Amino acid sequence: MKRTFQPSTIKRARTHGFRARMATKNGRQVLSRRRAKGRKRLTV
């Protein structure tokens, strides 16, 4: 049986990366929440 997690750095960055977050209004909200919480890393 094929495993569900097939890691790919490019796909990871394109879906969860900084530019992907900045592209939408909700993504920017995610970043602001993470900044407010004091996360060391905002995105992957």
From Swiss-Prot:
InterPro entries given in the database record: Ribosomal_bL34 (IPR000271), Ribosomal_bL34_CS (IPR020939)
Keyword Ribosomal protein: yes
UniProt KW Amino-acid biosynthesis keyword: no
UniProt keyword terms in alphabetical order: Ribonucleoprotein, Ribosomal protein
A Gene Ontology biological process term: translation
Pfam name, any one: Ribosomal_L34
GO cellular component, one term: ribonucleoprotein complex
GO molecular function, one term: structural constituent of ribosome
Annotated disulfide bonds: none
Disordered, as annotated region: 24-44
Compositionally biased tracts (Basic residues): 31-44
Family under the similarity heading: Belongs to the bacterial ribosomal protein bL34 family.
PANTHER family referenced in this protein's UniProt entry, alphabetically: LARGE RIBOSOMAL SUBUNIT PROTEIN BL34M, MITOCHONDRIAL RIBOSOMAL PROTEIN 34 FAMILY MEMBER
UniProt-recorded name of the protein: Large ribosomal subunit protein bL34
Species annotation: Stutzerimonas stutzeri (strain A1501)
